[in-house]
Amino acid sequence: MNELKQKYQDEIVSSLMDKFNYNSVMEVPKVEKIVINMGVGDAVQNSKALDSAVEELSLISGQKPMITRAKKSIAGFRLREGMPIGAKVTLRGERMYEFLQKLVAVSLPRVRDFRGISKKAFDGRGNYTLGVKEQLIFPEINYDKVSKIRGMDIVVVTTSNTDEEARELLAQLGMPFQK
């Protein structure tokens, strides 16, 4: 079992129960899934760009990404409905905890001028969205093989009802929030 999951079960559940006065263990919020999304705007002109993005996303997540397609045609972007324009991965279970641990311990500290992540990126329902400017912060990505620096969105979906509960859960899991 992943050590982050073990820590959640052993320490975090009891600490959150004390802090928020839950009656049952089932009320305690937990991380449900992590969605990593990479929008590839270049894919309209250059189909090879999407292939490299899919390859990088599969290296980062350890799982095959799903290709996302355009919902509408937009003439200004030379975009037709159904064209592939990005890739996303949904992580659950063991892979989710492994990715979260890697993100907190290895990847986020590698960001240049890193002073912690914003406390304001919660959506009001207890989900946290994090934007990453470059994929090079992940140790699996080889700098020499990168054709273009791309960012990605990482959404951490929790079962908590309020942002305060989710913030406490993520902070105890080791997310480095700004002071």
From Swiss-Prot:
Keywords: Ribonucleoprotein, Ribosomal protein, RNA-binding, rRNA-binding, tRNA-binding
Superkingdom of the organism of origin: Bacteria
UniProt-listed GO biological process terms: translation
GO annotation, cellular component aspect: ribonucleoprotein complex; ribosome
Matches recorded under SUPFAM superfamilies: RL5-like
Keyword tRNA-binding: yes
Protein's UniProt name: Large ribosomal subunit protein uL5
Organism: Oceanobacillus iheyensis (strain DSM 14371 / CIP 107618 / JCM 11309 / KCTC 3954 / HTE831)
Lineage of source species: Bacteria, Bacillati, Bacillota, Bacilli, Bacillales
